[in-house]
């Protein structure tokens, strides 16, 4: 039974990713900008001192504009980094996109030398 559910979930996920990948790049960019416009209009986000995001990959909603906006406003930016050995994810403070490096999964994440933030320091995710 669990195998059937897992297989169905994999199939649905693959179909949705294929659909998303098929969308024109200009349309994906337009929709990404609309998402972040609404995000930054949320009062709690405006008041936040530290915001946690992730670096998007492929055809996901692009987070690059949001990351740059957080950095340009002087707020603290937290991005996740996977510690595979410890099987944990830590939030690291990033001050510049040059602090990112490719993980073994091909995802851009903070370098291991970027400071780890306490989860209590993060005001908005």
Residue ranges and their predicted role:
Residues 2-123:
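N-terminal active-site beta-alpha-beta segment that forms phosphate/nucleotide-binding
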């Amino acid at each position: 039974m669990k195998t059937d559910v897992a297989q169905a979930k994999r199939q649905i996920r693959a179909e949705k990713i294929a659909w998303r990948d098929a969308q024109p790049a200009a349309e994906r960019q337009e929709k990404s900008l609309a998402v972040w416009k609404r995000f930054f209009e949320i009062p709690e986000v405006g008041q936040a001192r530290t915001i946690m995001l992730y670096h998007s990959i492929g055809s996901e909603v692009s987070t690059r504009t949001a990351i740059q906006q957080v950095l340009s406003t002087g707020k603290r930016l937290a991005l996740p980094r996977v510690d595979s050995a410890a099987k944990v994810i830590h939030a690291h403070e990033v001050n510049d996109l040059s602090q990112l490096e490719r993980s073994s999964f091909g995802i851009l994440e903070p370098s291991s030398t970027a400071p780890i933030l306490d989860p209590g320091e993060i005001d908005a995710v």
